[in-house]
Structures are given as C-alpha cells and as structure tokens.
C-alpha cells in the first residue's frame, strides 16, 4: 500500500465580485501548486511531486497567500496551466500502481482538486481513493 500525501496551494479572487463563474460552476479558488510525497510501508520516498500551476483567472496573489506559501507571481510566470500539471501529476501517480490512497493535511485539498477539474471540465475518474 502506498499513501500519497497531497498538499495544494491556491489563490483566491481579490474580492467576491471578481469570482469566476461558468454556467453553474463557480471557481472559488485556483490551484497554484500541487505537491505530493509517497509513503510506502511507513517509509517516506525520496520521490516527490512538486509543480507550480499558472493561474488563469486569479493571477493577483493576496499578501496573505504570498506570506503563507512563499509563492510569488514570478514563481508562477513560467509555470504550466492546470491541465498540463494534472497530466504530470497523474503520470507520477501511475508509477505507484493501483494500490494507492491519497491523504491530505486538511479537509479542503481533495474537494478543491475535484472542483477545479469540474470547473475546467476535466475527468476525475483517475483519482485514487482518498481520505
């Protein structure tokens, strides 16, 4: 069994009026980094995943986000968009086979990832079981 410890960082609209809406889908936050490490048989792997994501809509980082994450606008300037980073993350996950469970530090990471995929009309069927 391999546990993937996932941590997402995200940006927010600067105000409620700037929140992005597409039909019935609302983009409350936008992922700006995906980080993960594998733990197999209680051993933390040296193999990890960490990529910045270039935001499409919430490009202005609030001071609180910069302070909390240490991520700057410059870090995101040359990053790939979410679609490309998700493909890379999915490929990274595949090396661990089917016996994988995703765990997170908090309750928001997986729902945020799922909502982002839904907003951008991306499949979520590839996501392994998660807690």
Feature annotation, model-predicted:
Residues 2-111:
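Conserved non-catalytic scaffold segment of RNase H-like nuclease domains
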């Amino acid at each position: 069994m391999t546990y993937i410890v996932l941590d997402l960082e995200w940006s927010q609209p600067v105000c409620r009026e700037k929140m992005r809406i597409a039909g019935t889908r609302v983009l409350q936050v936008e992922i700006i980094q995906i980080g993960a490490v594998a733990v197999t048989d209680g051993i933390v792997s040296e193999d990890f995943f960490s990529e910045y994501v270039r935001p499409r809509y919430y490009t202005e980082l609030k001071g609180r986000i910069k302070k909390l994450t240490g991520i700057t606008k410059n870090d995101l300037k040359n990053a790939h968009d979410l679609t490309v980073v998700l493909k890379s993350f999915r490929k990274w996950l595949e090396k661990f086979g089917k016996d994988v469970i995703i765990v997170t530090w908090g309750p928001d990471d997986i729902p945020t990832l799922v909502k982002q995929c839904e907003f951008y009309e991306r499949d979520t069927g590839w996501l392994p079981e998660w807690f």
